[in-house]
Amino acid sequence: MNIALIAHDKKKSDMIQFAIAYRDILADHTLYATGTTGLRVKEATGLPIHRFQSGPLGGDQQIGALIADNAMDLVLFFRDPLTAQPHEPDVSALIRLCDVYTIPLATNMGTAEILVRNLNKGTFDFRDVAKNGGTNETT
């Protein structure tokens, strides 16, 4: 599965801790991330990560494009709800795209843990259904 990792500045340490804790699960998937988040997670875990621009410089939109193309399966976006973000319209657009295209979205470590543990158990069949036009055939 394709997984996006995004974290606002005050949540980057949470994302790094999460990626270290779930490194073995994340290693089985293709990872994408916005600029600094991807760099810091890669440095901490050694995981290969396709890095886009920083969020405010278009990285959120680049990940959004993958969502719109049905090429993203899960988004882990650790948001800082207490700090105003200069690129808030991009953040809102990304969240809206997750809703439009039925992409699971975790905005905090607790939800991310539930999603990643279930991903590891193989309970994300609905993504195969979405990719196969409403059938559960994986051929």
UniProtKB/Swiss-Prot annotation:
Cross-referenced NCBIfam families: MGSA (TIGR00160), PRK05234.1 (NF003559)
Protein name: Methylglyoxal synthase
One Gene Ontology CC term in the entry: cytosol
Stored SMART domains: MGS
Segments forming domain MGS-like: 1-139
Pfam families with a match to the protein in the record: MGS
PROSITE patterns: METHYLGLYOXAL_SYNTH, MGS
Binding positions (substrate): 8, 12, 34-37, 54-55, 87
EC number: 4.2.3.3
GO biological process terms, semicolon-separated: methylglyoxal biosynthetic process
Record-annotated active site: 60 (proton donor/acceptor)
Keyword annotations of the record: Lyase
InterPro entries registered for this protein in UniProt: Methylgl_synth, Methylglyoxal_synth_AS, MGS-like_dom, MGS-like_dom_sf
Taxonomic lineage from the root: Bacteria, Bacillati, Bacillota, Bacilli, Bacillales
Function, in words: Catalyzes the formation of methylglyoxal from dihydroxyacetone phosphate.
Gene Ontology molecular function, alphabetical: methylglyoxal synthase activity
Family affiliation: Belongs to the methylglyoxal synthase family.
GN (gene name): mgsA
Catalytic activity: dihydroxyacetone phosphate = methylglyoxal + phosphate
The keyword Nuclease is assigned to this record: no
